[in-house]
C-alpha cells in the first residue's frame, strides 16, 4: 500500500488527491496522511512562478517531515492577472510530475480585494457568506453553480501530474 503525503490540510485538496489516486492506482492501494507544511510563498501567491514554487516547496517540506513515504503531493492555488488556478506537484522516488489546473476568470470586485492584500478565500467568504468556502467548493464551485468544483478541477490536474510516475513510456525514458 502506497503511503501518500498530502502537503495540505485543506479537505477540498485532499479529496482531489484521493480521487486522482483512486483513478490512477485504484481504491484501497494507498493511504493519505495530510500534514501542514509551509509553502515559503505568501498566503495568496501571485503569478505562475510564485504559485508553482509554493507547490514545489510544499513537496520539499513534506519530504523532510515524512521521508519514508512513497508519494508527496503539493497543491498550491494562486492568482495570475485576473484568474485563479493551481499548481500540482507529485514526487515518487526521484520522479516529479507537475500540472497546472484550468483557470477561472475572477470578477473585478474580488480582484480589488486581492490587490489590497487579502486572500481569495477571504474575499469569496465575504461575497458569498459561505464560511471556509476555500475548503469546500471554492470560487470554481460557486461561479459554475457546482458544475465544477475546486476538487474536480484539481482532480483532473492531479491525474496529469501523476502521468510521469505511472505511464510506461515515462518509466522507460527515466530508466535510461
Swiss-Prot record:
It comes from the Bacteria. The keyword Metal-binding applies. It is an enzyme of class 3 (hydrolase). GO terms for molecular function: ITPase activity; metal ion binding; nucleotide binding; ribonucleoside triphosphate phosphatase activity. One of its GO terms (biological process) is thiamine metabolic process. Substrate binds at residues 8-13, 68-69. Its EC number is 3.6.1.73. Homodimer. This is Inosine/xanthosine triphosphatase. It comes from Photorhabdus laumondii subsp. laumondii (strain DSM 15139 / CIP 105565 / TT01).
Amino acid at each position: 500500500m502506497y503511503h501518500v503525503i498530502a502537503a495540505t490540510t485543506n479537505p477540498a485538496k485532499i479529496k482531489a488527491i484521493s480521487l486522482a489516486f483512486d483513478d490512477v492506482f485504484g481504491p484501497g492501494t494507498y493511504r493519505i496522511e495530510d500534514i501542514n507544511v509551509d509553502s515559503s510563498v505568501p498566503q495568496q501567491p501571485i503569478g505562475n512562478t510564485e504559485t508553482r514554487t509554493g507547490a514545489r516547496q510544499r513537496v520539499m517540506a513534506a519530504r523532510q517531515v515524512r521521508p519514508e513515504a512513497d508519494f508527496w503531493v503539493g497543491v498550491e492555488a494562486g492568482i495570475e492577472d485576473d484568474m485563479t488556478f493551481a499548481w500540482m506537484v507529485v514526487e515518487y522516488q526521484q520522479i516529479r510530475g507537475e500540472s497546472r489546473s484550468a483557470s477561472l476568470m475572477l470578477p473585478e470586485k474580488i480582484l480589488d480585494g486581492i490587490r489590497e492584500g487579502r486572500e481569495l478565500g477571504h474575499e469569496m467568504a465575504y461575497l458569498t457568506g459561505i464560511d471556509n468556502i476555500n475548503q469546500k467548493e471554492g470560487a470554481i464551485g460557486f461561479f459554475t453553480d457546482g458544475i465544477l468544483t475546486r476538487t474536480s478541477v484539481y482532480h483532473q490536474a492531479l491525474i496529469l501530474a501523476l502521468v510521469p510516475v505511472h505511464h510506461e513510456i515515462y518509466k522507460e525514458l527515466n530508466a535510461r
